[in-house]
UniProtKB/Swiss-Prot annotation:
The chain crosses the membrane at residues 25-45, 179-199, 237-257, 277-297. One of its GO terms (biological process) is cell division. The gene is ftsX. It is found in: Cell membrane. This is Cell division protein FtsX. Keywords: Cell cycle, Cell division, Cell membrane, Membrane, Transmembrane, Transmembrane helix. Its main location: membrane. Pfam families: FtsX, FtsX_ECD. The keyword Membrane applies. InterPro entries: ABC3_permease_C (IPR003838), FtsX (IPR004513), FtsX_ECD (IPR040690). NCBIfam families: FtsX_Gpos (NF038347). Interacts with FtsE. Interacts (via large extracellular loop) with PcsB (via N-terminal coiled coil domain). This interaction directs PcsB to equatorial and septal sites of dividing cells.
Amino acid sequence: MISRFFRHLFEALKSLKRNGWMTVAAVSSVMITLTLVAIFASVIFNTAKLATDIENNVRVVVYIRKDVEDNSQTIEKEGQTVTNNDYHKVYDSLKNMSTVKSVTFSSKEEQYEKLTEIMGDNWKIFEGDANPLYDAYIVEANAPNDVKTIAEDAKKIEGVSEVQDGGANTERLFKLASFIRVWGLGIAALLIFIAAFLISNTIRITIISRSREIQIMRLVGAKNSYIRGPFLLEGAFIGLLGAIAPSVLVFIVYQIVYQSVNKSLVGQNLSMISPDLFSPLMIALLFVIGVFIGSLGSGISMRRFLKI
């Protein structure tokens, strides 16, 4: 059994070397296909991740007027510290909504710190009294469909300056995620089929060039599995070689994209899939798909042209 495997392995490697240019063409087609598959997969998985993050973090930002101290129990008035009669009026109005999951206060100082982390030191000119930001309440909804209702009700609360719900952008992202999932997977499947077809043509030429040898093997009683073995291994090798370059690109490029794009997402409580998780899984998937494509292409040729 082991000796047969190594015999098939030797025949497959010898055939790849003998049909050098066709091997290069087949490997190149697999490489291009898997690169495109990796791109589509990266977009699909990360779009789905962002959509999930939004669904799990559906929120409305309610900005409080600058003349309202809703989160302080006392205020300074005419040089004296007095009780704040407006304490938590906005907070209580938001908290009492049946569609609200939680309400969290975010001071303008906290927002300023987050903004400088994202935008850089250019915003430091607004530090202290020059801070143009507003105190705000971060309101999490029970469900995505509740966002618009919460936003409309929050606008009616006295002391509220502005309300941001990101409704239109959120809906567009959900629609985009759905579109990419359906069409992205469809295009990836089409690319895999095309690569398998190209490999099948490469294997077919090999089969034709060795047709006399194959006929003799069949006449002397060689089993179908014995004849089929070297060709399946040859296809698998083509797929394996074609997966190397896309895997290297995934490892390098995804790391660069993650470091540059994820910074702008963190401030919105969103994130891409971590390279430590995504890259190993994607690389393993590319090698599996590569071997599958190669074996499938070889199998198609054997079935169509040898009638085995």
